[in-house]
Regions:
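Beta-rich, blade/repeat-based domains predominating
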Residues: 29-53, 74-88
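Blade-edge beta-strand/turn elements of extracellular beta-propeller
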Residues: 13-33, 58-72
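Short loop/turn segments immediately following beta-strands, especially the blade-tip
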Residues: 12-19, 102-111
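A detector of repeated loop/turn-to-beta-strand junctions in beta-rich toroidal repeat architectures
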Residues: 6-8, 20
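Conserved beta-strand positions in repeat-built beta-propeller and related beta-rich domains
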Residues: 1-5, 47-53, 59, 91-96
Length: 114
């Protein structure tokens, strides 16, 4: 769960009965670049993609910052989503445009029915 105001990501443990325990901060996304944590998705390897300062942050499953997809020009990412026939296209919404980038690892598909 990301917190836009405090600029960090919490992880929780989901128990067999569906209850949630063990809340902890796994990553602080504070940075001098513009942007805040907002949209967040995962890939099939469990990596976390979260909009944040400077673009889209890519984090390992334990919250280690592995890199940032830089947007440049002071642009702010607001949300992200996986798409394309192979789920390897990451769509990035910004204030006045939509960008996309091809990734090596497919994203977790959104179920059509819940």
């Amino acid at each position: 769960v990301n917190d836009s105001r405090l600029q960090h990501i919490h992880a929780f443990d989901v128990q067999g009965d569906g209850s949630i325990t063990g809340g902890r901060i796994i990553c602080h996304l504070k940075d001098e670049r513009p942007g805040k944590p907002d949209g967040m998705k995962c890939d099939l390897d469990g990596n976390i993609y979260c909009t944040g300062p400077g673009g889209v942050w890519i984090l390992s499953t334990n919250g280690q910052h592995m890199g940032t997809i830089a947007l440049g020009g002071g642009r702010h990412a607001t949300n992200i989503g996986w798409g394309g026939g192979d789920w390897k296209t990451l769509f990035i919404t910004l204030y006045h445009e939509i960008a996309c980038i091809r990734m090596k690892i497919p994203g977790v598909p959104v179920p059509r029915r819940i």
